[in-house]
């Protein structure tokens, strides 16, 4: 299969086709992925996001990989929903270190009616700073999805995690169909989709291919596809899983790039365990988005200055964003904070 043919956007990939991509010689696969990547993106630009946990721990879901699950004793400090003011301050700091997108994650099965007003104010406030907004809050119903869209949310993250066949071995508290339904609600509301999965949970090659097929065969490809490497946390059922072979992880990125040529493929959780050479291969394979800053929800993430040093050595620059004068952003931040101070939710979000 030539690189030129795979640059065409498709939604009808078969398991045999995708496994054949995985099984190519490594150099051939990287060449094909890089060729597809260059057809749609500047190969030396990477989109930079910051992720903030706005509510941590005590999640009722039983995802075997997750330290935030209330089913496992991982020693994670539980935190209630963050105050809106604090979220806006963190967003301003993310913008100052170069992020163009601010992602907010809450450890919920689904957001409750009492929490939604605070969440919507967070979206509006971050949006006013000139940042793209992204949230991951669990399963959504149609009304919640429409409310988030009306508040200005740009992206909603809802990962499929793995193939439909392996999914039941990892999670029992939410069905695969529910995840797909949430993605459909998000798309119907006009928001962009961020959806990917995790490597290193004991899945097979068929499962890795199956995950990518689910994503690539959606009616529209996700705009962002995060590929995570399992971060093994003591106390979770997957704490003793074998490490992912670095070349297998790079293959996953490359095949994701080929199947979804216009999507941003994000090098996500697990990057702290990757050396610079592995990260460079990831960018060569077509990864063009990273999380940037100190923490990725509850796991360490390479420090921002290390990222910029690596970018400089590789000749990579952060993806351009629409810029406004600093005083305009400052005015937006100040206005958002003033509005929050005049609202009861500004004070009560953490205890609601």
From Swiss-Prot:
EC annotation from Swiss-Prot or TrEMBL: 2.8.1.6
Binding site for [2Fe-2S] cluster: 103, 134, 194, 266
Cofactor: [4Fe-4S] cluster; [2Fe-2S] cluster
Short name of one Pfam family: BATS
Note accompanying the cofactor annotation: Binds 1 [4Fe-4S] cluster. The cluster is coordinated with 3 cysteines and an exchangeable S-adenosyl-L-methionine. Binds 1 [2Fe-2S] cluster. The cluster is coordinated with 3 cysteines and 1 arginine.
Keyword vocabulary terms for this entry: 2Fe-2S, 4Fe-4S, Biotin biosynthesis, Iron, Iron-sulfur, Metal-binding, S-adenosyl-L-methionine, Transferase
Catalysed reactions listed for this entry: (4R,5S)-dethiobiotin + (sulfur carrier)-SH + 2 reduced [2Fe-2S]-[ferredoxin] + 2 S-adenosyl-L-methionine = (sulfur carrier)-H + biotin + 2 5'-deoxyadenosine + 2 L-methionine + 2 oxidized [2Fe-2S]-[ferredoxin]
Domain Radical SAM core: 44-262
Pathway: Cofactor biosynthesis; biotin biosynthesis; biotin from 7,8-diaminononanoate: step 2/2
GO molecular function, one term: 4 iron, 4 sulfur cluster binding
Residues involved in [4Fe-4S] cluster binding: 59, 63, 66
GO biological process, one term: biotin biosynthetic process
Subunit structure: Homodimer.
Family note: Belongs to the radical SAM superfamily. Biotin synthase family.
Record function comment: Catalyzes the conversion of dethiobiotin (DTB) to biotin by the insertion of a sulfur atom into dethiobiotin via a radical-based mechanism.
Protein name: Biotin synthase
Gene: bioB
